[in-house]
Amino acid sequence: MFGVLNSDNHCAAVQQGNILAFGRTSSEFWTNNPTSSYRCETGGNRTDSGQSHIRRPMNAFMVWSRDQRRKVALENPQMQNSEISKRLGYQWKMLTEAEKRPFFEEAQRIQAMHREKYPDYKYRPRRKAVPKNSDKLLPAASSSMLCRQGNVDERWYPFTWRGGRTRASHSGTEDRLNSSQAANIVRSLLQQEHHCSSTSLRHSPETLAIQLSTDFYPK
């Protein structure tokens, strides 16, 4: 028995050592490989899409918020980027047309330069990645149905563990249980079902209404 336990512990230790060794080698590969480090810095594989991708020209709001965003971030270092964008959007709406005019003119100049540099440019928004169906969780109806099926299986098969493993083999069960014991088990289950059904029928609204009518209006 102790030999089996020691061998299991030894196997677990060997597996853990292999995992740690694989993690070290993979991390060394990523850090020593210049291509992989470039992917980590840029946030993905940009070897083919990075050269062909062309950024959109800035509009008037982007020209105005370029300096304002930096200023708000320095004044509020704990503020998140989404909150900064909300504040800048509100401030931009509060500006007058005269205050916005210089930024519109600058945006038109940037767009003209962009058209000259990239005459065949067309804006193509990136599509969001669609999650796989296998990663989705089961709906509530399916999970509740599985729970009900598990309860029914445990009720009608009392000689199985919850984990799905049988307590004994089929041959061992036949040796321990004879036909009379099996009949007694089935009879007790049927009696329980009959008792539950009769109890629910006794306390049903229709039965109570009939009893009340006979009490108030005797024949």
From Swiss-Prot:
This protein's GO CC annotations: cytoplasm; nuclear speck; nucleus
Pfam families per the UniProt record, alphabetical: HMG_box (PF00505)
Keyword Transcription carried by entry: yes
InterPro entries: HMG_box_dom (IPR009071), HMG_box_dom_sf (IPR036910), SRY (IPR017253), SRY-related_HMG-box_TF-like (IPR050140)
Protein's GO biological process: cell differentiation; male sex determination; sex differentiation
CDD domains assigned: HMG-box_SoxA_SoxB_SoxG (cd22028)
Keyword annotations from UniProtKB, A to Z: Activator, Calmodulin-binding, Cytoplasm, Differentiation, DNA-binding, Nucleus, Sexual differentiation, Transcription, Transcription regulation
Main localization category: nucleus
Keyword Transferase tagged: no
Cell compartment(s), UniProt: Nucleus speckle; Cytoplasm; Nucleus
Family annotation (PROSITE patterns): HMG_BOX_2
SUPFAM superfamilies named in the record: HMG-box
GO MF: calmodulin binding; DNA-binding transcription activator activity, RNA polymerase II-specific; RNA polymerase II cis-regulatory region sequence-specific DNA binding
DNA-binding region: 54-122
Superkingdom of source: Eukaryota
PANTHER family linked: SEX-DETERMINING REGION Y PROTEIN, SOX TRANSCRIPTION FACTOR
Function: Transcriptional regulator that controls a genetic switch in male development. It is necessary and sufficient for initiating male sex determination by directing the development of supporting cell precursors (pre-Sertoli cells) as Sertoli rather than granulosa cells. Involved in different aspects of gene regulation including promoter activation or repression. Binds to the DNA consensus sequence 5'-[AT]AACAA[AT]-3'. SRY HMG box recognizes DNA by partial intercalation in the minor groove and promotes DNA bending. Also involved in pre-mRNA splicing.
Quaternary data: Interacts with CALM, EP300, HDAC3, KPNB1, ZNF208 isoform KRAB-O, PARP1, SLC9A3R2 and WT1. The interaction with EP300 modulates its DNA-binding activity. The interaction with KPNB1 is sensitive to dissociation by Ran in the GTP-bound form. Interaction with PARP1 impaired its DNA-binding activity.
Family (UniProt): Belongs to the SRY family.
Protein name: Sex-determining region Y protein
Taxonomic source organism: Lutra lutra
Source species taxonomy: Eukaryota, Metazoa, Chordata, Craniata, Vertebrata
